[in-house]
Amino acid sequence: MAVERTLSIIKPDAVQKNAIGAILGRFEKAGLRIAAAKMLHLSRDDAGGFYAVHQARPFYGELCDFMSSGPVLVTVLEGEGAIAKNRDLMGATNPKDAAAGTIRADFADSIDANAVHGSDSAETAAWEISYFFGQREIFAH
């Protein structure tokens, strides 16, 4: 299996719950390494640019409002099969559908306030990582 990089965002709801350490610990326990990290308070424009792919969807405005409502922790995770591994750790988008023991089952409140974001493909990961990080900010292990 190839070593990959994926973007993960710990969203405002999980930051407010002081769940950053618990979530990062799950990534590390699963064999993912943190190659980059920064805490940010996104502007609505920042959130809108990041989620531009969803611009035509009915939830876009609320998503941008939520993602700019408080600080987030943006990380680049690295490891074998990192994209799929991160998505498995996160669980289903709607925490009501998330398997027990996943991040969303344990920390999310709703489909909107669902604790974490993770890239869904290698192409998306490359774009998402470049949205937040320059090459000099990412460190291979």
UniProtKB/Swiss-Prot annotation:
Subcellular location: Cytoplasm
Record GO biological process: CTP biosynthetic process; GTP biosynthetic process; UTP biosynthetic process
Residue stretches spanning the membrane: none
SUPFAM superfamilies (alphabetical): Nucleoside diphosphate kinase, NDK
One Pfam assignment: NDK
EC nos: 2.7.4.6
Catalytic activity of the protein: a 2'-deoxyribonucleoside 5'-diphosphate + ATP = a 2'-deoxyribonucleoside 5'-triphosphate + ADP; a ribonucleoside 5'-diphosphate + ATP = a ribonucleoside 5'-triphosphate + ADP
Recorded superkingdom: Bacteria
Active site: H117
Disulphide-bridged cysteine pairs: none
Record-level Gene Ontology MF annotations: ATP binding; metal ion binding; nucleoside diphosphate kinase activity
This protein's GO CC annotations: cytoplasm
Enzyme class: transferase
Needed cofactors: Mg(2+)
Keyword set, alphabetical order: ATP-binding, Cytoplasm, Kinase, Magnesium, Metal-binding, Nucleotide metabolism, Nucleotide-binding, Phosphoprotein, Transferase
Keyword set includes Ion transport: no
Binding site residues for ATP: K11, F59, R87, T93, R104, N114
CDD domains in alphabetical order: NDPk_I
SMART domains given in the database record: NDK
Role played: Major role in the synthesis of nucleoside triphosphates other than ATP. The ATP gamma phosphate is transferred to the NDP beta phosphate via a ping-pong mechanism, using a phosphorylated active-site intermediate.
Subunit structure: Homotetramer.
Family indicated by similarity: Belongs to the NDK family.
Name by which UniProt lists this protein: Nucleoside diphosphate kinase
The organism of origin for this protein: Acidithiobacillus ferrooxidans (strain ATCC 23270 / DSM 14882 / CIP 104768 / NCIMB 8455)
Gene it is expressed from: ndk
